[in-house]
C-alpha cells in the first residue's frame, strides 16, 4: 500500500528545533525561510503492509514499511553544499530529521486507522531487527519512489524502514513508543 503523508512543523516546534540542533533563536527567520523553501520540494510517502508475512517478526500483529520525504530534501541539501553553503545544508538536514519524525507519527496513525489496532512499539530496521530484512521488505513493497542501491542503501536518503508492533488495546502516545532510547544519540525527542 502507498499513502501520501503531509508532515509539517508547528509554531511550537521551533524553540525545540533550536535547542535540539544548537541554533540561537536569532537564526529562526533564516531557518524558517529555508523550511518554507523546502516544503514544495517534499514528496512524503509511506509504503507499507499490514500482512503478517515476515517470519523474523514474532508478534501476532504488526505492520512494516518505508517512510520517505522524497528526493527534494537531498537535492536542496546538495545544492547548498555545491555552493559551499554548509550551514544552510545542515539546516535542511535538521529540518528533514524533524519532518521525518512527524512523518513516522503520521504513518503510525494511518496504520492504526486501517488496521483497527493500536501501536505498542515503533522499531527501526537495524535496531531490533536485522538489516538483512531490507531486501525482502523492499521486494514485497516495491516502492516506486525509493531505490535500493547495490550498496544496500535506500535513496532518497531521508527514508526509514519501520516495523510497528500493534495490539488490540491502546497504549502510550506514539511519541513515547520509539524503542531506541538506550542507544539514541538525540538530545531530545521530537
Where are the regions that the model predicts?
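Generic secondary-structure signature for well-ordered alpha-helical cores
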Residues: 43, 112, 116, 186-189
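Active-site helix-to-loop segments that bind/position phosphate- or nucleotide-bearing substrates
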Residues: 1-84, 88
